[in-house]
Amino acid sequence: MVHAFLIHTLRAPNLEDTGLCRVLYSCVFGAEKSPDDPRSHGAERDRLFRKEQILAVARQVESLCRLQQQAAGCSSTDLQPQFSAEPVSLHEAPHGAFHLAAGDPFQEPRTVLWLGILSLGFALVLDTHENLLLAERTLRLLARLLLDHLRLLTPAVSTGAAYCRAHPSR
């Protein structure tokens, strides 16, 4: 089961930018109560609790994306959006999956599948037993459809790829 879908900002590694990761959109499917208190909280407190959980996932995705880009040998200039006539390729975009232990930040263990495109992070929070191949294809399809709808993948409007392309000399 998918527990959440989120879109958030990604920053390039090695930049002086001290801005925080921002969640641009999130949708949580199902409710999870605060782990320390079985009694019912107000709707506002539950909303803030879910917001904190989603922000924790977004920060971990951003951290892993930056780590993957640095490990690939990308410099900060390689990760800046470039003006280009080439369409953005979703197959070259950084992606991955990681496991969240119970209590960090959800009560149950979860798997997070993520994709980084054009300084945006897309993530699905899943049950640990979900089919990751199917979930990855679904996430790529969602990202492509959203970016197509916003006209971010077309060469005329695109600000370029915000992910590292391997240098031939490396």
UniProtKB/Swiss-Prot annotation:
**Which residue spans traverse the membrane?**
none
Alphabetized UniProt keyword annotations: Cytoplasm, DNA damage, DNA repair, Endosome, Lysosome, Membrane, Protein transport, Transport
Matching entries from Pfam families are given as: AP-5_subunit_s1
Q: Could you give the subunit structure recorded for this chain?
A: Probably part of the adaptor protein complex 5 (AP-5) a tetramer composed of AP5B1, AP5M1, AP5S1 and AP5Z1. Interacts with ZFYVE26 and SPG11.
Would I find Chloroplast among this entry's keywords? no
Name where it mostly resides: cytoplasm
Tell me where it resides.
Answer: Cytoplasm, Cytosol; Late endosome membrane; Lysosome membrane
| UniProt function note | As part of AP-5, a probable fifth adaptor protein complex it may be involved in endosomal transport.
Kindly give the membrane topology term recorded for this protein.
Answer: Peripheral membrane protein
Q: What is this protein called?
A: AP-5 complex subunit sigma-1
